[in-house]
Amino acid sequence: MKKYLGIVLMALVIAGCTSRVPQTEQPATIEPAVPTPSKPQLPPSESQPLPTPPKIQVPVLDWSAAVTPLVGQMVKTDGIARGSILLLNKLKNNTNGSLQTAQATTALYNALASSGQFTMVSREQLGVARQSLGLSEEDSLESRSKAVGLARYVGAQYVLYADASGDVKSPELSMQLMLVQTGEIVWSGNGTVRQQ
């Protein structure tokens, strides 16, 4: 019965479609598009120099003036034995622009080496250790577990983290010295980096 009712309903719908009177409408007029003449774009002639793009100006910061007093405070920390092995992590850029972090890390490395308090893990030794552990050269060791693993691999007792934040023209520098054995932060300090 339901099949019969469905067939009758379909027949009525189909019959209703054919009995509609078609409405006549005027066909839409199509106007052909008239192309507008345009001047062809010519490449600039060789006699006309191209404008030079603006250079990104990275501020020249005095890193050594900022890190030297902080290193001076750090070496006075109680409990740090002279000659302790220190692994220096790359400076992390958390500013609102681009910083030359390699210069900052080098200034920090030089200040620490000249203090005589620490025996620094050499860059060559650090590179070999990174390769052995499968860490890339670009890995900034933000993960404390990676830093501790690398420090233990090279035999370092301390890891120094450095971070620049705030305005790129005058960033705030913060440093933390971590004891590898326990993960304890044994010293931290802050300073402002000024332009040269």
Swiss-Prot record:
Matching Pfam families: LpoB (PF13036)
Biased composition (Pro residues): 34-43
Any one of the GO CC terms: periplasmic side of cell outer membrane
Subcellular location: Cell outer membrane
Protein name per the record: Penicillin-binding protein activator LpoB
Listed InterPro entries: LpoB
GO molecular function: enzyme regulator activity
Entry membrane topology: Lipid-anchor
Family (UniProt): Belongs to the LpoB family.
Organism: Dickeya dadantii (strain 3937) (Erwinia chrysanthemi (strain 3937))
Signal peptide from the UniProt entry: 1-16
